[in-house]
């Protein structure tokens, strides 16, 4: 059950800590909208990967089991056509190490080819040539 009133109150909160405190007071771990989205992704066999640059971070939706070139094609068809390789950081490694540079220095940035099956939460940079 999702309460529209509760979801509305959560949506109006700008501060992450305030939202978390509100959820705890309501006896919830996460909002109903988050649970709904997660359930829909699971039901539809979808997952998310990320791209990040100096000024932007984006989340992209793909099907579970998609390989790196297909993921690149979600961003732009030229990326899929001219796919060379992908640099990949696992989400948990990025959370623990905090920066791309720290992940690279710790050897946590992998270089993957056309057969790499993208994992949920991967942070990816694509190299391509068209």
PLM region spans:
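C-terminal-of-GTPase-core extension/linker across diverse P-loop GTPases
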Residues: 1-119, 129-130
């Amino acid at each position: 059950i999702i309460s529209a009133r509760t979801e509305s109150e959560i949506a109006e909160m700008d501060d992450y800590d305030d939202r978390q405190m509100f959820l705890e007071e309501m006896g919830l771990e996460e909002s109903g909208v988050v649970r709904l989205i997660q359930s829909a992704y699971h039901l539809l066999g979808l997952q998310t990967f990320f791209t990040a640059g100096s000024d932007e971070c984006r989340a992209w939706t793909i099907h579970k089991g998609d390989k790196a070139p297909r993921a690149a094609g979600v961003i732009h068809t030229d990326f899929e056509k001219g796919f060379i390789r992908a640099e990949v950081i696992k989400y948990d490694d990025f959370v623990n190490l905090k920066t791309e540079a720290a992940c690279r220095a710790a050897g946590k940035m992998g270089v993957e080819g056309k057969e790499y099956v993208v994992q949920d939460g991967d942070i990816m940079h694509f190299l391509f040539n068209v």
